[in-house]
Amino acid sequence: MKKIIFIILAFGCMLSLSAFDVMDISGDIGLGYMNHNMVTVYNDSLKTNLAGGLEAALGEGNLTMDAPRSVDSYNALALGLKLKVSYVYANISVGFPFTQVPTGDDPLGEKLKAMGATNRLNNSVIVDSQIGLGINILKSLPVNIFVGGGLGINYIQTKRKLPDEFVQTIVDPITGNPVAKELNETRSIAMSGLGFTVALNYYFTKNIGISFDIKDTVYFIPMSNKRYYKGKAINGSGFTYTITKEKKQDIQSLIKYSWANNLALRLAVAFKL
């Protein structure tokens, strides 16, 4: 209850300051399109074996080799909100992708692909946020431009059902009998980076207008990268299986580096308080 009262009082203070031109408060809310591309470069265990084979066949030398990499692309309908208070702004977009478009080499996904795993996603979400500093150009005119830049934080969670052909390969190592009847893959990735926001605003009244926003962020600092599987055993019991390596509950040890780009375009209702 105290938190609710505090939020109401804080919002009331902001409105009061805005009314006396002490604080400039504006923003927009609307629908748009989101494109998210995730690039992952993996550590390559083949390099050591290839170097040994070449040395035996050709003689001692140095080997340079491209590391395997994959690109996962997502297109989504997005909801977005931007709030600007004086020179500080916050921008968040939430996208709902329905398909994944993978290209390149994903060592963890090759077996699933061979079994006919679908690229259709279920209950997946991309949350892309940005906070930073920005200014309004031509602020006093009905048509003005907002330009800002700052820190971006992105979280993506994708889910897909794995094919029955693959589930049937999960068998008891002793009896050879199937032990699972359903399996779903979940990927969870969080990253941070830097980005910018540009918006063209047109106010047809003093406080209400329309806005076209462009938000683009490059992510290069990994925060979390997990891939796990949920399913049902043959007796109906639910289970969760997390890929591990060297006793770590993630796949970071398989990844050399990764980066991502998120682009969001939005047509929105603009407002000023």
Residue ranges and their predicted role:
Residues 33-37, 75, 90-92, 119, ...:
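Polar/charged side chains located within well-ordered beta-strands of beta-rich proteins
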Residues 39-69, 98-124, 155-189, 224-256:
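Flexible, solvent-exposed loop segments that connect beta-strands
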Residues 19-86, 262-272:
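Short glycine/proline- and aromatic-enriched beta-strand/turn motifs that initiate or cap beta-hairpins
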Residues 72-80, 124-130, 191-195, 260-264:
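Transmembrane beta-barrel architecture of outer-membrane proteins
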Residues 201-273:
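Predominantly the C-terminal beta-signal and adjacent terminal strand-loop region
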Residues 79-174, 266-273:
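Gram-negative (and chloroplast) outer-membrane scaffold detector with strong preference
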Residues 1-24:
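Cleavable N-terminal export/targeting peptides
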Residues 24-26, 89, 142-146, 199, ...:
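Membrane-spanning beta-strand positions in outer-membrane beta-barrel proteins
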